[in-house]
Structures are given as structure tokens and as C-alpha cells.
């Protein structure tokens, strides 16, 4: 049930963004075995001039926020972070050193799923 929001510098062609979406999806399925039908990913593009890394304005970087149901192990989360970071580097060429992944765990009572019900009500 992972929901990913990616902050990506503007300027990448649509084909690269599609490749990134596919790569991120594979990263999620490969690392935490989430069912494909439960994965949601959106790209939010940010002008490079609106970013700063280590005091340097305009340094390309990627921030990925992952919202998911609590319960994954520390190792699964580490694998997810590694897979997502590699997917960014492989798909759009932004260094793994300039990618950050933030994981937010939600209890099953605090996350809505298909049908407008909580994950708990859906049987998760």
C-alpha cells in the first residue's frame, strides 16, 4: 500500500519520468514485496533554482516520501531506501548521494484505502 511522492527537479523529458515511475514501482515490489495494485506514485517537479543542497543553490536532488502501513522490518525499510535511491540514479541520472528517502509509517486505523474505508476496515 505504499504511496510515494517524489520531488524531482524540472527538466526531465516525459519518457525519463515514465521510466522513473516504472523503476520506482519495481523498487517497491522488489524490496518489500508490495502488491502492484497497491502502489501509488506521483512526481512533483521543483525548479532547480528552488533547491539548495549543502549551501549550494540549484544543486539537483530528489526527495522521496513513502507513506505505508506500519509493520515493515528495519531491514525491509533499508532495502526499500536502497532500491529507490538506485532507481533514481539509474532512471534519471541523479546521484544516489543526492537522493533522500523519508518513510512514514501509519497505523491501519489512520490510512484510507479503496472504497473510502480505513486499512483496518478493509481487513489489513
How does the language model describe each region?
Residues 2-124:
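A domain-level signal for the structural core that forms small-molecule/cofactor-binding pockets
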Amino acid at each position: 500500500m505504499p504511496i510515494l511522492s517524489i520531488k524531482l527537479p524540472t527538466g526531465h523529458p516525459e519518457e525519463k519520468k515514465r521510466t522513473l515511475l516504472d523503476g520506482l514501482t519495481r523498487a517497491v515490489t522488489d524490496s518489500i514485496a508490495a502488491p502492484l495494485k497497491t502502489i501509488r506514485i506521483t512526481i512533483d517537479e521543483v525548479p532547480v533554482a528552488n533547491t539548495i543542497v549543502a549551501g549550494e543553490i540549484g544543486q539537483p536532488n530528489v526527495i522521496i516520501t513513502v507513506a505505508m502501513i506500519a509493520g515493515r522490518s528495519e531491514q525491509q525499510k533499508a532495502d526499500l531506501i536502497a532500491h529507490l535511491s538506485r532507481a533514481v540514479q539509474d532512471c534519471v541520472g541523479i546521484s544516489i548521494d543526492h537522493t533522500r528517502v523519508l518513510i512514514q509509517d501509519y497505523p491501519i486505523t489512520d490510512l484510507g484505502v479503496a472504497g473510502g474505508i480505513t486499512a483496518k476496515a478493509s481487513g489489513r
